[in-house]
Each structure stands twice: as structure tokens, then as C-alpha cells.
Amino acid sequence: MIVLGIESSCDETAAAVVRDGRVLLSNVIASQIGEHSKYGGVVPEIASRKHIEAVIPVILQALHDAGMELSDIEGIAVTRGPGLVGSLLVGLSVAKALAFSRKLPLVGIHHLEGHIAAIFLSEKVPEFPFIALVVSGGHTNIYFVRGFGLFTLLGQTRDDAAGEAFDKAAKLLNIGYPGGVVIDRLAKEGDRNLLNFPRAMKESLDFSFSGLKTSLLVHVKKHGSPSAREDLAHLVAAYQEAIVDVLVEKTLKAAKMNSVPQVVVCGGVASNSRLREHFMERSREENIDLFIPPPVLCTDNAAMIAVVGENLLNKGKSEELSINAVSRWPLDVAGSFR
């Protein structure tokens, strides 16, 4: 089955064509980073307007790159939530229009399930069940995954997501946006062991990054923001390491607690080079099979949405054209919508 995926949950407008849920034929992403960087974060109104401008060209480019016509598409999958409602509605409206005009089946997809499913576009794929860490700007969750649509939430952030912890640190230090990318790049020049930031490593599988953020703020108030690039690199390297340590250790702990020797790491923050490196180191030590999509499939994209869509469409699932966007949508109850 050839599926067109559409994603517009935040600040990337994306479209992709995927065959049989495994073969990526095209993957087009229009980023809005340049539009939002001056504000230090995503402005919902601007995001919605930019999606309107980009969505049709992006879909046409995805079809062109795949060597396809719209008549070749057999089903449409679109992100339904969670996300910014104004942004979601752009992709959802276009998907509905295409489905209606071409008489194609349509399925609305949970954004986080898409992130988890991105791994099935890799050469090496896990078998069910597995543990999944979904780590992004808005989410930091650990799931027990028994199959498509079958998720049990094991742990989540109690305050900021890991991506927010990166972005807020970058804003505090005035080093640019998006914070995770800037910190990842700069941290490579620093020594992560020169400073020691706190790790919230309680018995629970839940996360908390508020104490880490406060610790950085106290450090800056006491010592000032580093003026020398070398000192700044040491600071962000140590801060990044504190985030990475917690993400890795709690995820591997979840795998051991549930006797599941397979871990999938996904979401935008999964493109962080130190996180990938440390997960590889620790998973080898713990004899756990690690699966991480390539960076281009970690950030928001429509290919991952098409993968989930293909699975649902092959089961005969489809949505009414009356479906609406869902701004808040727990993944472990997503199946109740189907």
C-alpha cells in the first residue's frame, strides 16, 4: 500500500510517501526555525500561517520526489494530535480535502506513535514488545510497547520535557535557538566532567528537570554567564550530560524492570549526538539491543505518520471526515479513538 503522510503538529510542515510501511519513497520537511528563532521559541500564530503557505508545495514536492501522482496514492495519514491546534488544523484540513476529492481512506495519527514507528523505516527493526523513550521538546515519556496502538505509560516528566530543558538553558545563556542543537554542537568542545549538575534519579521512572534548570540559574547568578567560548562549552557539556544521564539510566532501568531487552529511542532530542553515544555505550554494557532512527527521522516528519497510517489502513480502519484536531491526547488511551 502506498500512503501519503502529512505532519503539521508544531513548526515543521512535512509530507512523505511510504510504501508498505517500510519503504521510504520521499520525505519533505519545511522548517520554520528561521521564523521563530528571533522569539526564542515557537509562536503558534506564526506557525499556523507558515503551515498554510507551505503545506501544498510540500505535498507536491513529496509526490514529485517519490515519482508519484496523486492518483497513485492509496490512503492518507495525517497527524491528529497532540500539538498546536492551529498548526494541526492546517494539515488535517488539507488531508480531509484530498481524501474527499480522491475518495481515499483517511486515518488520523497520534504524533508520538509516529515517533515510535519511525524505527520501522530503519534497516534494523525491533520485535514487539520493546521499551520506547519518546524524548522531544514537549514530551519525555517511557512506554512499554506491545504492538501498534498498544502502549503502557511507564514514566513521564513531572515538569519540563528534556527538549524544554535544553531550550531554556540556551535562552538563559543567550546562545541561540533551537537550544538542543546549539548545546549539542557547543558541548563537543567542552569537558563534561569539569562541573557537576544534579540528576533526579529517584526510584520512580518519572523525570524531573526543574532542579537541574534551577541549578544552572544559580550557577549563572553566582559566576555570571561565561564570556569565553571554552568556559561556555564546559558549562553546556556538563549540563547536557546531566540530562543525558537521567534519560539513559531510567530508560534502561525500565527495560530491566520489565525484562524487555530491546529499547527504542525516538523524538527530536534523540538526534542529540551525546545521547546517542551514551545510549550505545550503556546498552552494550547492559546487553540490551538499542534502536534509534537516523536523525532526519527523529525530528518531526511525515514518514513516521505514514508508517502508522499504513498499519491502520491495512486493518481496514478509516476516519470520518468530521474528525478534529486533539491538542492533548495521552498515547496510552489513543486506541479509544479507533
From Swiss-Prot:
UniProt name for this protein: tRNA N6-adenosine threonylcarbamoyltransferase
Reactions listed under catalytic activity: L-threonylcarbamoyladenylate + adenosine(37) in tRNA = N(6)-L-threonylcarbamoyladenosine(37) in tRNA + AMP + H(+)
EC number, as in UniProt: 2.3.1.234
Domain of life: Bacteria
Binding note for cofactor: Binds 1 Fe(2+) ion per subunit.
Role noted for this protein: Required for the formation of a threonylcarbamoyl group on adenosine at position 37 (t(6)A37) in tRNAs that read codons beginning with adenine. Is involved in the transfer of the threonylcarbamoyl moiety of threonylcarbamoyl-AMP (TC-AMP) to the N6 group of A37, together with TsaE and TsaB. TsaD likely plays a direct catalytic role in this reaction.
Gene Ontology biological-process annotations: tRNA threonylcarbamoyladenosine modification
Enzyme class at the top of the EC tree: transferase
HAMAP family linked: TsaD (MF_01445)
Similarity comment: family membership: Belongs to the KAE1 / TsaD family.
Binding site for Fe cation: 111, 115, 300
GO cellular component annotations of the record: cytoplasm
